[in-house]
UniProtKB/Swiss-Prot annotation:
This is Lectin BRA-3. SMART domains: CLECT. The keyword Nucleus does not apply. Residues 1-24 form the signal peptide. GO terms for molecular function: carbohydrate binding. It holds the Pfam family Lectin_C. Residues 25-152 form the C-type lectin domain. The keyword Iron does not apply. Keywords: Calcium, Disulfide bond, Lectin, Signal. Homotetramer; disulfide-linked. It comes from the Eukaryota. Coelemic fluid.
Length: 162
């Protein structure tokens, strides 16, 4: 083996080692909570839904209004978050009755409370409603000020989760 091949092999080993031993963490700037490869942060202040989207991006690059993709994730958030009505990324702003996540993720899971979404007085934005035991969701007027929930992938880990 020539010297250049040895250097290449050692470099490759160092890179693989660095990737596999990378510390996967949530940002340290706020009280982020970790669950299933993602970090969650509940705001301590209230804003309108559109401003909440911008606030998540400001709090940490790559953060967005939370998506909730399973009953287990919803239960984690319900147990972790102390605020009781939080904006999430779910909305039907573009097409009434067709709820989508603001970050483009598929809307495969929903957990609406009974008779919701109801679009009462033009309610187009999703709220997690943790003041009930069930943690079900509601739709509300996007122009109301509410606390909000940000979500982002854990940082420091390769996408494949090695």
């Amino acid at each position: 083996m020539q010297r250049s091949e040895i250097v290449q092999a050692v470099t490759l080993l160092v890179v693989v080692f660095a990737i596999t031993t990378a510390e996967c963490t949530c940002p340290g700037n706020l009280d982020w909570q970790e669950y299933d490869g993602h970090c969650y942060w509940a705001s301590t202040y209230q804003v309108r839904w559109n401003d909440a989207q911008l606030a998540c991006q400001t709090v940490h690059p790559g953060a967005y209004l939370a998506t909730i993709q399973s009953q287990l994730e919803n239960a984690f958030i319900s147990e972790t978050v102390s605020n009781n009505r939080l904006w999430i990324g779910l909305n039907d702003i573009d097409l009434e009755g067709h709820y989508v996540w603001s970050n483009g993720e598929a809307t495969d899971f929903t957990y609406w409370s009974s008779n919701n979404p109801n679009n009462w007085e033009n309610q187009d934005c999703g709220v997690v409603n943790y003041d009930t035991v069930t943690g079900q969701w509601d739709d509300d007027d996007c122009n109301k000020n509410k606390n909000f929930l940000c979500k982002m992938p854990i940082i420091g880990c390769p996408p494949c989760g090695i």
